[in-house]
Amino acid sequence: MKFAEHLSAHITPEWRKQYIQYEAFKEMLYAAQDQAPSIEVTDEDTVKRYYAKFEEIFFQTCEKELAKINTFYSEKLAEAQRRSATLQNELQSSLDAQRESSAIPGLRQRRKAVFALTHEERVQHRNIKDLKLAFSEFYLSLILLQNYQNLNFTGFRKILKKHDKILETSRGADWRVAHVEVAPFYTCKKINQLISETETVVTNELESGDRQKAMKRLRVPPLGAAQPAPAWTTFRVGLYCGIFIVLNMAIIMAGSHYLLGKDVWPMVRIYRGGFLLIEFLFLLGINTYGWRQAGVNHVLIFELNPRNNLSHQHLFEIAGFLGILWCFSLFSCIFGLWINLQMHLNPLILYGLMLLFLVNPTKTFYYKSRFWLLKLLFRVFTAPFHKVGFADFWLADQLNSLAVILMDLEFMICFYSFELKWGDSDGLVNSANSVCNSYSYGVRAVVQCIPAWLRFIQCLRRYRDTKRAFPHLVNAGKYSTTFFMVTFAALYSTHKERNHSDAQVFFYLWIIFYLISSCYTLIWDLKMDWGLFDRNAGENTFLREEIVYPQKAYYYCAIIQDVILRFAWTIQISVTSLNLFTDAGDIISTVLAPLEVFRRFVWNFFRLENEHLNNCGEFRAVRDISVAPLNADDQTLLEQMMDQDDGVKNRVKSRIWKRSQSMSLRRPRLSSQSKMKDAKILIDDTDDEANT
């Protein structure tokens, strides 16, 4: 592998601009070689002066790169030393508290027998668990810094050796000895000492001297590296997807033959939510694949466990498996009379199995990922009582696009409670009324507002924590427009059913607030969530200064589809109002629901890209984990202090200036990455010029 590819494959994405600009140096050397005056048409002194002037510029550039690397390495090393001291103090405090609580073993055992663990013991246990996680993240940051050290030294050695070969001189090697080999980033071995100390502390203090267990906890692949799925997983993905496609075609043919002339809408509404969930999981798998390929570190952004998280193939497998269950359940509905199973039992069995898959307490079927999702859902639905993180409001945003699932769930509960004729074998296609699909009792309107309400209270909670009206209160205003839109839609629907004369008034109010909501959310999507239409976009017209994905066309197409799908509701209202054909509203809404999931799928790419660029600007490469976090008041006070004119603002300006000096970010395919041993990057030190 060429070193340029090796460097691109193994750098930490969030520190990309702090590495040696190896490709730029190569271009300098090749350009100098191509533009050099020929010895055949000019004298030797002119050629020597040309190369002498070039070398002066070349070595000045090397000095600037070396100074940049030394500065960044020193800052990160100092940060690591401070973090190490903090973790050591927290560990010592936890161990001291643990020893004090166990000083009277008899009393402690009696307490355990009667009251199980005391509150103090539970807190200590939780602190030790948090410390293990904090040390593993800290160890990862040390490995990344060691990797930074090794890659930059190898980069200088390679480029200076190439310099000597092209210019037929030894001044590059001399410069390396005089400058690089004595540079602080290379000579400083404190990083190795910190790594060794961390391994020792985790082994002796947290894993009771079991080094194998300690190293298993510490060793981790680099963030952003694709975790190869087993061959059987790949096989199952292909098998499930193939079966799902074939079954869907069979369902369409069977349904058009056996259900012709029947009222299939209750069955469609009941099964529609399951299909949208399967579509969402499959598209999320594509999101995950795209993020990995582009170098968007979603593992860090979602604060996932880098040792154990779902890859795109795992998501495809889950979506395919659930898709097959969904198809078999629908088949059983259609052919219920032939298999002696009442039609209305099939959805209950299907969604019961899906729920069981999610809450299964055994450590099987991606237990850690399912438990992470359940905790996240709990945090989303109890938003006012927790500090809101990125994963929390990201999931709530997904729920806003999956609101149809909640509405279909409400319909299913209502239908089974009031409309279903349990004695009929074909109850799902033999409904006498459609009360459950209306706003008659107001429950449907409340359910429709739940996702927007969750984001609304999240924004209020973030405002409480940060005291920043913009963007949090402004964002809350965006979600509040949904409440008005749904309210007037419900009023219009109920007044129209009862032939009230004021129905048209509510219709126009509904349209006005729908229009306001769509414009509000569209502007927020493009400007705030995606960071587009930046004044400093430069050559990236209408985009932003830095872009991750390789083609600008991706961004322009995403803007167009977002505009179209944000206003797709106008088609539904127009067709429904004009009554162009039977069941127009149901047909259009069934088509638009998966399109909204697709819009959110596209939104995810650019929302995480924007968050990734924020992490790059802050050089944040690992999770921030603290055993003793600041409370909300202290956090607010600290942020206010940092906002002073002589504080962090100057650093922000400096970061903006630095970002303006760089080109678009792009990470090559991760297939070129090599495996790590003990989570340490091994740099190929070969001197073979074919590999440079």
UniProtKB/Swiss-Prot annotation:
Keywords for this protein: Cell membrane, Membrane, Transmembrane, Transmembrane helix
UniProt-listed GO biological process terms: intracellular phosphate ion homeostasis; phosphate ion transmembrane transport
Pfam family for this entry, one: EXS
UniProt-annotated location(s): Cell membrane
Alphabetized InterPro entries for the sequence: EXS_C, SPX_dom
Domain spans labelled SPX: 1-177
Annotated segments matching region Important for inositol polyphosphate binding: 158-165
Protein name: Xenotropic and polytropic retrovirus receptor 1 homolog
